[in-house]
């Protein structure tokens, strides 16, 4: 983990209020694991005070560039969406424990399931798994057609299924409906998205290895403030820190309350 300034290469809207930002700098050399995140200071002023945690969607190591994808909905991310090419951004990272690629072997099938803004980290993961010979399938869930992004990029790596809650694109319903209706088989599931989605996946496949990346509000991003604790399934008084111990966990390790 290091603190550094990265330069904005591009920052564009790719879906409704969804932005893709490419950053460049020496810090990218330390981005080695899919599923980690950056803690970004969105303004040089005192407000907003807290950094914003945003997952890494794509790493271009040879260019020292990395891409993040975020939803501009709050004060901080709206400020981030106004950043222009050439500006510098104060970044702390990479943070957290990402996905362990060794949990799925060459020739096996990995089912990657993402919901909304939980989709981005799965792209870098899919790239890495495909490179090692894993058969990758994707199920991506969104609220509506206007929210869909990166479909073609995922499709280039493996079979990709889209679900929208309102049925305006792809299958109508949730990611769990798509998995069941298409009878998608897999050896390992790796997912990222809202807690209700993660809980549904955990409950639906208790006998399968399911890995989840949790979305939690964070304060410090380094485990000091206890803002993102989550109880474990082993003991009601035991907990983990999502920013430090996660955000990726084996589903059976954490208690998911919706």
UniProtKB/Swiss-Prot annotation:
One of its GO terms (biological process) is 'de novo' UMP biosynthetic process. FAD binds at residues 52-55, 69-71, 76-77. It comes from the Bacteria. Residues 1-101 form the FAD-binding FR-type domain. It holds the Pfam family DHODB_Fe-S_bind. Its cofactor is [2Fe-2S] cluster; FAD. Pathway: Pyrimidine metabolism; UMP biosynthesis via de novo pathway; orotate from (S)-dihydroorotate (NAD(+) route): step 1/1. InterPro entries: Cyt_c3_hydrogenase_gsu, Dihydroorotate_DH_ele_sf, Dihydroorotate_DH_Fe-S-bd, Dihydroorotate_DHASE_ETsu, FAD-bd_FR_type, FNR_nucleotide-bd, PyrK_electron_transfer, Riboflavin_synthase-like_b-brl. Binds 1 [2Fe-2S] cluster per subunit. Binds 1 FAD per subunit. The keyword S-adenosyl-L-methionine does not apply. Gene3D superfamilies: Dihydroorotate dehydrogenase, electron transfer subunit, Nucleotide-binding domain of ferredoxin-NADP reductase (FNR) module, Translation factors. [2Fe-2S] cluster binds at residues 220, 225, 228, 243. Belongs to the PyrK family. Responsible for channeling the electrons from the oxidation of dihydroorotate from the FMN redox center in the PyrD type B subunit to the ultimate electron acceptor NAD(+). This is Dihydroorotate dehydrogenase B (NAD(+)), electron transfer subunit.
